[in-house]
């Protein structure tokens, strides 16, 4: 099966300046992500960046690079620009892998592409089971709710579904016994759909939750959710995250 991985790599970061270029075990962070995408069996891996320093660094380790605008409001807008510039066919499967996830398991990159290939939808993603009360009530852990066919009903930062009769005694054991899902921020799209997605006006719902995928649901698209074969470790958002990843990859 053919699929293309696009890795958005934005230069500006309020918490970690030059984040994609930060050294981890002798390599820039973006190279670790690129290597994981290669290991996933992608037909093509493209780094999409808005800065010449990232472009030069990526080309030096052999990556294909597409320069994009620095005015995009989301990673999906950057994907759409790459699809247009590279003239990627509408039926091509695109996997969006974040440029700050050097520990992403290659198996889930290929899994989300295969998931989309099997389903008659334009967008697919992955989730893992929630097992702790702390995660359930953590707004940074996005919850996903799917129907019997694995189609997304909703994504939220709130605990969904809400256990009305167990709110007072909700503990880790109860959470683990239910089918609560934590969304993993990896997506596969059909390339033509990405262009449609960015043509839609942003919705109040996605802005309220700060969850971009809600735009697709609002406009009536289906998103297929599959349980990930391997739970990924967290990406790099803070200096503490960076130091932890450096220790793991040392």
UniProtKB/Swiss-Prot annotation:
Pathway: Nucleotide-sugar biosynthesis; CMP-3-deoxy-D-manno-octulosonate biosynthesis; CMP-3-deoxy-D-manno-octulosonate from 3-deoxy-D-manno-octulosonate and CTP: step 1/1; Bacterial outer membrane biogenesis; lipopolysaccharide biosynthesis. Keywords: Cytoplasm, Lipopolysaccharide biosynthesis, Nucleotidyltransferase, Transferase. It catalyses: 3-deoxy-alpha-D-manno-oct-2-ulosonate + CTP = CMP-3-deoxy-beta-D-manno-octulosonate + diphosphate. One of its GO terms (cellular component) is cytosol. It is found in: Cytoplasm. Its EC number is 2.7.7.38. One of its GO terms (molecular function) is 3-deoxy-manno-octulosonate cytidylyltransferase activity. Pfam families: CTP_transf_3. Its main location: cytoplasm. GO terms for biological process: CMP-keto-3-deoxy-D-manno-octulosonic acid biosynthetic process; lipopolysaccharide biosynthetic process. It comes from the Bacteria. It is an enzyme of class 2 (transferase). HAMAP family: KdsB. Activates KDO (a required 8-carbon sugar) for incorporation into bacterial lipopolysaccharide in Gram-negative bacteria. Belongs to the KdsB family. This is 3-deoxy-manno-octulosonate cytidylyltransferase. It comes from Actinobacillus pleuropneumoniae serotype 3 (strain JL03).
């Amino acid at each position: 099966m053919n699929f293309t991985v696009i890795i958005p790599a934005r230069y500006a970061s309020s918490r970690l300046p030059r984040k994609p270029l930060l050294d981890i075990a002798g390599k820039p962070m973006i190279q670790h992500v690129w290597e994981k995408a290669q290991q996933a069996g992608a037909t093509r891996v493209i780094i999409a960046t808005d800065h010449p320093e990232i472009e030069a660094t990526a080309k030096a380790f052999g990556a294909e690079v597409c320069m994009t605008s620095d005015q995009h409001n989301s990673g999906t807008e950057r994907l759409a620009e790459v699809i247009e510039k590279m003239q990627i066919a509408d039926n091509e499967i695109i996997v969006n892998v974040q440029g700050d996830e050097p520990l992403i398991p290659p198996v889930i990159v290929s899994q989300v592409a295969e998931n989309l290939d099997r389903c008659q939808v334009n967008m697919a993603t992955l989730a893992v089971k929630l097992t702790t009360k702390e995660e359930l009530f953590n707004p940074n852990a996005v919850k996903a709710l799917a129907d019997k066919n694995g189609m997304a009903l909703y994504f939220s930062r709130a605990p969904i579904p809400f256990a009305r009769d167990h709110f007072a005694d909700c503990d880790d054991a109860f959470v683990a016994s239910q089918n609560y899902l934590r969304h993993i921020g990896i997506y596969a799209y059909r390339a033509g759909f990405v262009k449609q997605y960015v043509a839609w006006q942003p919705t109040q719902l996605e802005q309220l939750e700060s969850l971009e995928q809600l735009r697709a649901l609002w406009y009536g698209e289906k998103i297929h959710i599959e349980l990930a074969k391997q739970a990924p470790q967290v990406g790099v958002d803070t200096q503490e995250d960076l130091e932890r990843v450096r220790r793991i990859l040392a």
